[in-house]
Amino acid sequence: MTGSLWVGTYPDGGPAGSGEGIWRVRVDASTGELSAARLVVETPAPSFLALHPRGHTLYAVAEVDKGTVTAFAVSPDGLAPLGTQATGGALPCHVLATADALYVANYGSGDFTTFGLAADGGFAGGPEVHGNSGSGPDPERQEGPHAHYIGIVGDEVWVSDLGTDELRRYRPRPGGASAAGIAARLPAGAGPRHFVAIGDVVVVATELVAGVYVLDHQTAAVVARHDVAAARGHLQPSHLALSPDGSHLFVAVRGVDVLSTFAVSAGAVRLEHLADTPVGRGPRHFAVLPPIAGTDAALVVVADQQASTLTALRVDRETGSGTPVGSVPLPAPACVLPAR
């Protein structure tokens, strides 16, 4: 059985808008082999993608100074633009789609932007922009707010801010969201990047002081902190995600360029580090696919941004170690998204 992936990219050796775009790659579900990478549409700096829950619309940010987000209608023939909107902020780096709303994190300006969505997945009205203020102790990376990632936690939308060491909460409403205060504060200088909700806890990967924090969803208290990898050296976590059955947590770590695997137990309060699997340079993002046919091994496809390669790993359930089973060259991949 063959599936496919959408892949967003960064500019490859040139300024934003110089030819980068959205690619599609085939993946063999029985082996993990990757093939037939092709550029589907050229669009500036599509560093992050999101798919509408119905699968009929794909959204791509343009991570440029005057940020935009574009909606594309998905068809067997490719992608057709439905419209482009300004995000009202700079350097949008993450986008999340629900049935009736689109959420964007603007890294450069620290803003969180919301859009209402029409039935066809296109935009329904202009942006609603929520600003933020503050800073952290790192003068180079925390001189101001830097919204980085958006996730659904319970019935709220949470936004991580790498610049202020905060997770902010918002309550969705038709066409937008209402600010609801600070969900959690991480240790000063930690730099929260991506997070995932698991039951009653939220697990956060911090980029500046590399670590994995487990937070109580209700009290925001830090329940546990784990090293992000066994390796030593420059550690810079990028993305984290669960296996389909919730039994394992994967964390991509740049610098040492590994995919770390943790076993999840006791409602994610306990994470046991199992293994670090070498990948290509600059693992910025990855997608966790259903297990390879006939096995219980996870299939993880990693976007090795600096190596300009997609790497598919077969990750053993018991040991957490990954074995490369496929790769394909692709210019500066930044985001991997399973197609439907």
Where are these regions (language model features)?
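Loop/turn-rich, solvent-exposed surfaces of beta-rich toroidal or solenoidal domains
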Residues: L235-V302
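Asp-box/WD-like beta-propeller blade repeats and closely related beta-sheet repeat scaffolds
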Residues: L79-Y149
